[in-house]
UniProtKB/Swiss-Prot annotation:
Keywords recorded for this protein, A-Z: Bacterial flagellum, Cell inner membrane, Cell membrane, Chemotaxis, Flagellar rotation, Membrane
Any GO CC annotation of this UniProt entry: plasma membrane
Main localisation: membrane
GO annotation terms (biological process): bacterial-type flagellum-dependent cell motility; chemotaxis
Pfam families linked to this entry: FliMN_C (PF01052)
Cell location: Cell inner membrane; Bacterial flagellum basal body
Organism: Borreliella burgdorferi (strain ATCC 35210 / DSM 4680 / CIP 102532 / B31) (Borrelia burgdorferi)
GO molecular function: cytoskeletal motor activity
Highest taxon listed in the record's lineage: Bacteria
Protein name: Flagellar motor switch protein FliN
Purpose of the protein: FliN is one of three proteins (FliG, FliN, FliM) that form the rotor-mounted switch complex (C ring), located at the base of the basal body. This complex interacts with the CheY and CheZ chemotaxis proteins, in addition to contacting components of the motor that determine the direction of flagellar rotation.
InterPro entries tied to this protein: FliN, FliN-like_C, FliN/MopA/SpaO, FliN_T3SS_HrcQb, SpoA-like_sf
Entry membrane topology: Peripheral membrane protein
Family that this chain belongs to: Belongs to the FliN/MopA/SpaO family.
């Protein structure tokens, strides 16, 4: 749904900002943030996962152009944001010009936090 569209009850959706914790405030005790400069140019893989499904090999081999794959998430449900394969946040899919994007709506806290 775009910002200009109305929700099911006929009202424009309310858009709220998300307050994310400052990374420096979440560092474990004894970690010196001045050493982070060495890591700033390290690349990490960021993946946005719309959903998952499981299929038998025969079904996968039978796929062709036009095959529709149903995923385990509903349309409009938050998507998972992973860094190097580990879920770190949830977000909502947005369209920016002609590209897809993701607006972060929740940062997943680790067990240590």
């Amino acid at each position: 749904m775009s910002v200009d569209e109305k929700s099911d009850n006929g009202e424009k959706p309310e858009i709220k900002g998300v307050k994310l914790p400052d990374l420096i405030d979440t560092l474990p005790e004894g970690v010196d943030p001045s050493n982070f400069g060495l890591l700033m140019d390290v690349s990490m893989q960021l993946t946005v996962e719309l959903g998952r499904t499981e299929r038998k090999i025969k079904d996968i081999l039978g796929m062709s152009e036009g095959t529709i794959i149903t995923l385990d998430k509903l349309a409009g449900e938050p998507v998972d944001i992973l860094v190097n394969g580990k879920i770190v946040a949830k977000g909502e899919v947005v369209v920016i010009d002609e590209n897809f994007g993701v607006r972060i709506t929740e940062i997943i806290k680790t067990k240590n936090e």
